[in-house]
């Protein structure tokens, strides 16, 4: 048997080597860790901190330094006020600030307001760029419409 084939079989776990004559081949049992185990460990750690559940939290938004927001819809929140510890459970979604703007204006702090100003400035510059293109189109359309002359009342001519 060549060494390459032996190494492949050893990697699979199908070859016993060095265990002696009487030892049977045994497959290694793979134990899959579940997230439930992590949750139990987290729960026991939080119980040590004496956390209390906070009811009626509709949403949680965490503002990141790059301007994006981690948004939790209907999360479970536990708090330990003396140790200033908060635990938030739920599915978090990465969203841009523009997606949440109307609903989160009252939640913004001074840092987030600065990023909102930058966002507004970039939006205005985009609008001006689009507006410049539209103005060119408007000027072409204005050639068909005559200018109003002062002193003339066109409504009298209609009647």
Swiss-Prot record:
Role: Component of the nascent polypeptide-associated complex (NAC), a dynamic component of the ribosomal exit tunnel, protecting the emerging polypeptides from interaction with other cytoplasmic proteins to ensure appropriate nascent protein targeting. The NAC complex also promotes mitochondrial protein import by enhancing productive ribosome interactions with the outer mitochondrial membrane and blocks the inappropriate interaction of ribosomes translating non-secretory nascent polypeptides with translocation sites in the membrane of the endoplasmic reticulum.
Family of this protein: Belongs to the NAC-beta family.
Subcellular locations according to the entry: Cytoplasm; Nucleus
GO cellular component, one term: nascent polypeptide-associated complex
Positions in coiled-coil regions: none
GO biological process terms on file: protein transport
Pfam families: NAC (PF01849)
Biased composition (Basic residues): 23-32
PANTHER family in the record: TRANSCRIPTION FACTOR BTF3 FAMILY MEMBER
Keywords: Cytoplasm, Nucleus, Protein transport, Repressor, Transcription, Transcription regulation, Transport
Organism: Sclerotinia sclerotiorum (strain ATCC 18683 / 1980 / Ss-1) (White mold)
Biased composition (Acidic residues): 136-153
Subunit relationships: Part of the nascent polypeptide-associated complex (NAC), consisting of EGD2 and EGD1. NAC associates with ribosomes via EGD1.
Principal subcellular localisation of the protein: cytoplasm
Region Disordered: start-end pairs: 1-39, 124-159
This protein's name: Nascent polypeptide-associated complex subunit beta
Annotated ranges, domain NAC-A/B: 36-101
């Amino acid at each position: 048997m060549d060494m390459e084939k032996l190494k492949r079989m050893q990697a699979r776990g199908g070859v016993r080597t060095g265990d002696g004559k009487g030892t049977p081949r045994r497959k290694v049992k793979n134990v899959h860790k579940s997230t439930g185990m992590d949750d139990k460990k987290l729960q026991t750690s939080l119980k040590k901190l004496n956390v209390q559940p906070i009811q009626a939290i509709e949403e949680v938004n965490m503002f990141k330094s790059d301007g994006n927001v981690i948004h939790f819809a209907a999360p479970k929140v536990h708090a330990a006020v003396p140790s200033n510890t908060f635990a938030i459970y739920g599915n978090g979604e990465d969203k841009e600030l523009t997606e949440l703007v109307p609903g989160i204006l009252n939640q913004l702090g001074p840092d987030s307001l600065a990023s909102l100003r930058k966002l507004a400035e970039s939006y205005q510059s985009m609008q001006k760029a689009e507006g410049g293109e539209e103005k060119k189109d408007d000027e072409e359309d204005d050639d068909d419409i005559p200018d109003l002359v002062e002193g003339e009342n066109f409504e009298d001519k209609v009647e």
